């Protein structure tokens, strides 16, 4: 087997093993249980969550803060490593991009779940108050999702084209799917130049967007009269806290994927050492 075929076998799409199928079944059961609980909340009201004055948002806001922090750090790490052209980033940077996108999508879903009347979500735009951090939260999260998606997709184009060509003779259906998402990528100089400029621009954009995202979330807390929350230092506090929690979550995800997919040849101890130094920094 050539190195190319071995590489495709290692990192290309694979069928679920028995353990993978059991894990997917478990996750589907969790989703079904969550949907049932959410329907109960819609019918009975948020009283079923047992949230009161002293437990204002409960698990919802905890999940929201965690997902935003992890997404922020994943995006910042990707952007900084791409802008500095650090070569050691290559084996795991795609994982960081996926984590960043998945977490910010989950943060948006958490907001919808937390709303007592999601059918009135349009009122957030119709009757928006620009002095409210909630309004800016509604604006910044979709923006961050779009930029994160593009920052994942544009560098992915050559990989999709490789899989398109690889399966062209063995699996026409997969080849067509990858060909559709590869968007006629042919490695021309024009395409490579445009891709490089686009990724560079997106990396520059996502850093201030991430800082704004974390700052706005901090203002959701600091603009209240609750003792200990009414403080102007919440934004830097949230950003520093996000760096700790987010990098920790990112390292955990990389380790789990590395071990589960047997990618020790690609993600080595050297990369964890680098991520540890980044964590300390």
Residue spans of the language-model regions?
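N-terminal signal-anchor module of multipass membrane proteins
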Residues: 1-73
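Long, contiguous internal "core" modules enriched in hydrophobic/ aromatic residues
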Residues: 11-14, 20-38, 86-88, 126, ...
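Helix-boundary and loop/linker segments of multi-pass membrane transporters
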Residues: 49-54, 95-96, 226, 267-271
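Alpha-helical transmembrane segments and their immediate interhelical/interface regions
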Residues: 51-75, 109, 168-169, 235-255
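Membrane helical hairpin/interfacial module
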Residues: 55-119
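Membrane-embedded alpha-helical bundles of multi-pass integral membrane proteins
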Residues: 55-59, 125-132
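Juxtamembrane membrane-interface segments at transmembrane alpha-helix termini
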Residues: 105-108, 134-138
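Transmembrane alpha-helix boundary signature
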Residues: 111-124, 153-157
